[in-house]
UniProtKB/Swiss-Prot annotation:
Top-level taxonomic group: Eukaryota
Recorded GO CC terms: nucleus
Annotated protein name in UniProt: BTB/POZ and MATH domain-containing protein 2
Biased segments, Polar residues type: 13-29
Gene from which the chain derives: BPM2
UniProt source species: Arabidopsis thaliana
């Protein structure tokens, strides 16, 4: 469908005054339809004479009536019945009907080697075909050589199958809509969030680091499979009205509840204040671990994205360890790529986070070494030698090694 936008300015308006602007849109598209015409008893219609035809029943496309005409002895005397002719004709009253056509002689062997003549799917130099009046035709006088047709897979059980597609071109102009009823955005998250803030109807309380957090069992169960099992599953605790959380810190649990109810990340400063120990990366790391524990996949992905954006020399090692522990493969790949860069490797190895990485995930060191080696193989100097990624003389465990000469 082609679209043309037209803007009109009121004449006589000056630059110093506000201009009145109106808009309209012209839309041109095709109304498509198809018809299958089966010709049985081909041997009986052959020989009926040049210019004689068999016609399909009429069919409607785009508000107009159409028919398929098959000439078994051809349409033109000059062809001397060497070719069969095939046409599509306008069968209803109409003037200057513009349309696209496709005529197909179907291969009845199942090999899909149809003979197709089509306007569709290609650029036409003069645009769609125009039929001026009832009886106007489009097609081919020499559609197929008759001798070849009679020995082909198009003829089966003394019958032919013709398929015709018609696309009638229609245009319309749309002006601005006079009436509009705005639909407000969903307030579901805000409504549940207000429910959390009010505490009304709360039927479970969580105790975290000496703080209490009231919540609603059904909301938690709907959002988290882990909470659903903990609150309503066969292995649920005897006391589901008060649950002690020991491995998640209070600010993180507060953010977790906020996401469950609001379905969006909270403002970190509003929830955790200005405590410097809760840097944004550290918050995202703890929140990712909590999201993984309670099977909140969307929150987990949000945390992965934030950690990926915040990768730096000082944070990448601990983030890599976290990604390994919680199977965050995309985040892990981003961390490995960052560390393996020659300008980053030495600095990362000198951080406390790298010491933590060696202790918590020693298997990652060999994986990192392989990654660096692969990168090294693709990093060649102009002389054809490898660049030395360990020019500082350290291995991945921080030990001094003898530098190689090139």
């Amino acid at each position: 469908m082609d679209t043309i936008r037209v803007s009109k300015e009121v004449p006589g308006s000056s630059k110093s005054t506000a201009q009145s602007l109106t808009e309209s849109t012209s839309r041109t598209e095709t109304i498509n339809g198809s018809h299958e015409f089966k010709i049985s008893g081909y041997s009986l219609v052959k020989g009926m004479g040049i210019g004689k035809y068999v016609a399909s029943d009429t069919f409607m496309v785009g508000g107009y009536s159409w028919a398929i005409y098959f000439y078994p002895d051809g349409k033109s005397p000059e062809d001397n019945s060497v070719y069969v002719s095939l046409f599509i004709a306008l069968a209803s009253e109409g003037a200057d009907v513009r349309a696209l056509f496709e005529l197909t002689l179907v291969d009845q062997s199942g090999n899909e080697r149809h003979k197709v003549h089509s306007h569709f799917g290609r650029t036409l130099e003069s645009g769609p075909y125009t039929l001026k009046y009832r009886g106007s035709m489009w097609g081919y006088k020499r559609f197929f050589k008759r001798s070849l047709l009679e020995s082909s897979d198009y003829l089966k059980d003394n019958g032919l199958l013709v398929r015709c597609c018609v696309g009638v071109v229609k245009s319309r102009t749309e002006g601005p809509r006079c009436y509009n009823i705005p639909v407000p955005v969903s307030g579901l998250g805000q409504q549940f969030g207000k429910l959390l803030e009010s505490g009304k109807g709360a039927d479970v309380t969580f105790e975290v680091d000496g703080e209490t957090f009231p919540a609603h069992k059904l909301v938690l169960a709907a959002r988290s499979a882990v909470f659903r099992a903990q609150l309503f599953g066969p292995l649920r605790s005897e006391n589901t009205n008060c649950i002690i959380i020991e491995d998640v810190q209070a600010p993180i649990f507060k953010m977790l509840l906020h996401f469950i109810y609001w379905d969006e990340m909270p403002d970190m400063q509003d929830l955790i204040g200005t405590d410097l120990k809760w840097a944004s990366t550290l918050v995202a790391q703890h929140l990712l671990a909590a999201a993984d524990r309670y099977a909140l996949e969307r929150l987990r992905t949000i945390c992965e994205s934030k950690l990926c954006e915040g990768i730096s020399i000082n944070t990448v090692a601990t983030t890599l360890a976290l990604a390994e522990q919680h199977h965050c493969f995309q985040l892990k790949a981003a961390c490995l790529k960052f560390i393996a860069l020659p300008e980053n490797l030495k600095a990362v190895m000198e951080t406390d986070g790298f010491d933590y990485l060696k202790e918590s995930c020693p298997s990652l060191l060999s994986e990192l070494l392989e990654y660096v080696a692969r990168l090294s193989e693709h990093s060649l100097t102009s002389s054809g030698h490898r660049k030395e990624l360990f020019a500082d003389g350290c291995d991945l465990n921080g030990r001094r090694v003898k530098q190689r000469l090139h």
